């Protein structure tokens, strides 16, 4: 068991978090599983739900009040939550029975202030929590723009943000150069009379620029934001340590690489220039939309402009899918042959069989 999900540490962490919540003048705090990109998988430095509760599943949310707390999980994680999350510290709430909003409406004291980090929730989620707080006679309160997430403030051994090197996804596998993709998306924005689009989904940026990374488990993406304008220029906000001369040559003059801490200023500039900005409210953090609106930009709510063209697979991608299935089919066949030979001897468990299958797949990757 790693330090991040050691149940014996949870009481100490919960006390520290409640102290920080009180220091901020709040009566509670929402702890989602998500990071700033709203992805399913997050880097170790963004495992705030695991740090707070001990729960290491890929979906969940906790609400921590001054004298009680609850964790909300779907049916996949019922047994895992029982094993990882101390029942005496958190109410275990299956989502089929109790939603976060219904629990808040029932348990949040009248007049209380429930805090949230607008980097970690979408506008739709914020709206639903606002209704729940109103039903409780309480108030939903965003952290101040310059305030650290209270978990980050007390997470003394928090891992550093990932800095894995960016790699090129070759055109031979993508079936399109990133210049072709860029023109396609830019032309689509121009046709809709949209000046620019803010991209927050890491898979969209990886697809658009034909790049890959290793910032999060199981998904070869880079944690980055991007702004693409209708003339085909791109601002890419990413830790410079992830870049190499090869990547800079690949991106060329069309892409301006900037440090992540300049992202807010870039959004402000869009407002100063009175730009019409496409933003996907279903996937972008509420912070991004709030910053754009405050700056004076005209927010055009709509789908991420990369999602539809990304879904249309090229001939090269289809060939890659078929090749992957052939490799995986060979691995599975070897596994079934192994299982047929070894199972009669006994001693094979579900876990050991899964390990064997994974090793065969890795050998054939």
Predicted segment positions?
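Terminal domain-start leader segments
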Residues: 1-276, 280-365
């Amino acid at each position: 068991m790693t330090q991040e999900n050691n149940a014996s540490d949870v009481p100490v962490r919960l006390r520290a978090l409640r102290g920080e919540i009180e220091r901020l003048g709040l009566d509670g705090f929402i702890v989602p599983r998500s990071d700033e990109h709203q992805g399913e998988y997050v880097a170790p430095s963004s495992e705030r739900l695991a740090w707070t509760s001990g729960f290491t599943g890929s979906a969940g949310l906790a609400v921590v009040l001054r004298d009680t707390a609850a964790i909300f999980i779907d049916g996949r994680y019922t047994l895992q939550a029982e094993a990882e999350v101390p029942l005496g510290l958190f109410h275990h709430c299956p989502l089929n029975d109790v939603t976060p909003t219904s629990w808040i409406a029932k348990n949040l004291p009248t007049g209380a202030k429930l805090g949230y980090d607008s980097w970690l929730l979408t506008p739709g989620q914020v709206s639903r929590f606002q209704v729940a707080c109103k039903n409780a006679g309480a108030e939903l309160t965003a952290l101040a723009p310059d305030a650290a997430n209270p978990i980050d403030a007390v997470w003394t051994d928090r891992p550093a943000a990932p800095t894995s090197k960016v790699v090129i996804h070759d055109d031979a596998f993508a079936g399109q150069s990133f210049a072709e993709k860029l023109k396609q998306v830019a032309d689509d924005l121009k046709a809709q009379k949209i000046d620019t689009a803010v991209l927050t989904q890491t898979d969209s940026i990886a697809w658009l620029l034909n790049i890959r990374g290793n910032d999060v488990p199981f998904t070869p993406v880079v944690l980055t934001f991007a702004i693409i304008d209708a003339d085909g220029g791109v601002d890419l906000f990413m830790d410079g340590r992830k870049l190499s001369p090869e990547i800079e040559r690949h991106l060329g003059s069309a892409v301006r690489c900037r440090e992540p801490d300049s992202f807010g200023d870039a959004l402000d500039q869009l407002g100063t220039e009175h730009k019409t900005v496409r933003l996907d409210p279903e996937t972008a953090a509420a912070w991004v939309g709030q910053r754009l609106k405050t700056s004076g930009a005209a927010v055009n709510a709509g789908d991420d402009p990369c999602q539809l063209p990304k879904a249309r697979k090229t001939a090269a991608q289809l060939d890659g899918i078929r090749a992957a299935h052939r490799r995986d089919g060979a691995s599975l066949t070897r596994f079934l042959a192994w299982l047929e030979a070894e199972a009669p001897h006994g001693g094979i468990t579900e876990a050991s069989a899964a390990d064997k299958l994974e090793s065969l797949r890795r050998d054939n990757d």
